[in-house]
Swiss-Prot record:
Deletion phenotype: Results in a significant decrease in survival after desiccation but does not affect survival under frozen conditions.
Keywords from the named record: Secreted, Signal, Stress response
Region spans: SAHS-c2: 72-100
Major subcellular site: secreted
Induction: Expression is highly induced during desiccation.
A GO cellular component entry from the record: extracellular region
Family (UniProt): Belongs to the Secretory-abundant heat soluble protein (SAHS) family.
Record protein name field: Secretory-abundant heat soluble protein 68234
Cleaved signal peptide residues: 1-19
CDD domains on file: FABP
């Protein structure tokens, strides 16, 4: 169960999901808002060392998979939708900048706090029962989103290509 939580945190998906009402979805205003895709062949750096440092089982993150990150604002909240289409997985994370969100999975509680550092979106995840912390930074350079992951002294990166600023958020998974 703890490995599952670490895997979720690794992909930036540890948070609560909640209804947001009828506020319009905003896809612009921050450089990190939009839809970004990492294909199987896209660039990554130091990924296996990072996965090893988290103690994840083989099925999490070793083989390259298509990954989609969608981040938009709705009212006072943001949504970070993380999807692995080949694994039929999608998670919608609702967050407010600067506020910690907790999620309980079995006996474990993971805490996530999103904030801004200049033009970057930062997600700090703590899983106290595993003694793990993960920092993810989302930085846009041109038409690319560079996601930098850090745990302990291990740093890894993945590059995503900007696809678009959609006009509608996708339907939420149950």
């Amino acid at each position: 169960m703890a490995r599952f939580l670490v895997a979720l945190a690794l992909f930036g998906v540890v948070a609560m999901t909640a209804a947001t009402g009828d506020a319009p979805k905003e896809w612009s205003g921050k450089p990190w808002l939009g839809k970004f895709v990492a294909e199987v062949t896209d660039k990554s750096e130091n990924w296996e060392a990072f996965v090893d440092a988290l103690g994840l089982p083989e099925q999490f993150g070793r083989a390259p998979v298509k990954t989609i990150q969608k981040i938009y604002k709705q009212g006072d909240h943001y949504h970070h939708i993380f999807a692995l289409p080949d694994k039929n997985f999608e998670k919608d994370i609702e967050f407010t900048l600067g506020q910690e969100v907790e999620i309980k999975q079995g006996e474990h509680i993971a805490k996530t706090k999103y904030s801004e550092d200049g033009e970057k979106l930062v997600a700090d995840v703590s899983i106290p029962t595993k003694g793990k912390t993960i920092r993810s930074e989302y930085e846009v350079q041109g038409d690319q989103l560079i996601k930098t992951y850090k745990t302990g002294d291990i740093v890894a990166k993945k590059w995503f290509k900007k696809v678009a600023n959609p006009t509608e958020a996708p339907a939420q998974a149950a």
